[in-house]
Amino acid sequence: MEQAPPDPERQLQPAPLEPLGSPDAVLGAAVGKETEGAGEESSGVDTMTHNNFWLKKIEISVSEAEKRTGRNAMNMQETYTAYLIETRSIEHTDGQSVLTDSLWRRYSEFELLRSYLLVYYPHIVVPPLPEKRAEFVWHKLSADNMDPDFVERRRIGLENFLLRIASHPLLCRDKIFYLFLTQEGNWKETVNETGFQLKADSRLKALNATFRVKNPDKRFTDLKHYSDELQSVISHLLRVRARVADRLYGVYKVHGNYGRVFSEWSAIEKEMGDGLQSAGHHMDVYASSIDDILEDEEHYADQLKEYLFYAEALRAVCRKHELMQYDLEMAAQDLASKKQQCEELATGTVRTFSLKGMTTKLFGQETPEQREARIKVLEEQINEGEQQLKSKNLEGREFVKNAWADIERFKEQKNRDLKEALISYAVMQISMCKKGIQVWTNAKECFSKM
């Protein structure tokens, strides 16, 4: 069954795109014109345009991770990791950085911040958080979320998350984000007071819109398919990398057997002993070097994982668009139904089977006064419906314009970051191979001197 062609009057139409600035690693917070839209609707949460905090260059870092024990909401003891967030103002006069704020946050507070941003900025591809538990691990890597190496990688990921928000032209001005960096006490209460949970779209409603929307925007449909494919490709890449890491670890560690054998052999040789002993030492160094190599690899894997999770952020924007398109179509359908009812009452003809037609046949016609009263009510509802439809159309067009501009910004960022990560990974592999060549060259010299 062919899909009906989109109705241009009922489908959300884009406005001309306005490219946004690309993110920087450090906040250069010259804040200009206020951005209209979701930030202004933030239930009394003001943007940070005029705050002196953003009129300086700010460095944001997650400098430490600390294991702590406390009581949860159920009054049960739990162990968790807290992260120290430091913000520093870079003074232009002498170039020295001055510590302005320092506070501790739990991972759950980072999650709360992101949930808030998703609700109030639905047209933005909100940066993802690093994984809460290790995924795509190879067998020698600990999957424990309290493992020091994993906690360190997550610390780096959380810092990157804050820098992504801080470098975004709209998110950086949000007051809740500012308070996240500066207000340690009662921050959760401040977030909850915005009422963002009540404004969040239900999963059931979003799923319903996905299957029932009649005129989806092809660009957002294609974007959703792209995000699925991107997630699939990066997942496969990470699985392959984990398998390679497993095998590479085994190959390197087996070289430790060379070292042991050469050392044992050197004990029974007089003339060849020194050369064999030296060669064995080089083999031991080679075998132990894989631990640092694979630890470095994890950082590149984490960069890929960030875009694995970005795929879900893209889908969140697409789901919001589907919801708005579905609401628009339902409003148009309701308006058309009321216009038909009004026409039927005015002419006295019923075009289709209806409960009203049945009651008329059973109980007789309405009096002219009753019919006039009903027509008047319907006309008022039609006027309200037309205004509502117009408002939804304008809101939808604004959403498409802002969302597509941010998606273009995200694509530029993605291309730049993934290119850099893949090149760095290739350079690391080349360096690893060169070290292997150097080890065997040294071993060859040892054998030559025997």
From Swiss-Prot:
The keyword Transport applies. Signal peptide: none annotated. The modification Phosphoserine is found at residue 22. GO terms for cellular component: cytoplasmic dynein complex; early endosome; early endosome membrane; plasma membrane; SNARE complex. It comes from the Eukaryota. CDD domains: BAR_SNX4, PX_SNX4. PROSITE patterns: PX. Keywords: Acetylation, Endosome, Lipid-binding, Membrane, Phosphoprotein, Protein transport, Transport. The modification N-acetylmethionine is found at residue 1. It is a peripheral membrane protein. Heterodimer; heterodimerizes with SNX7 or SNX30. Interacts with WWC1/KIBRA. Identified in a complex with WWC1/KIBRA and dynein components DYNLL1 and DYNC1I2. Interacts with BIN1. Belongs to the sorting nexin family. The PX domain binds phosphatidylinositol 3-phosphate which is necessary for peripheral membrane localization. This is Sorting nexin-4. It comes from Pongo abelii (Sumatran orangutan). The gene is SNX4.
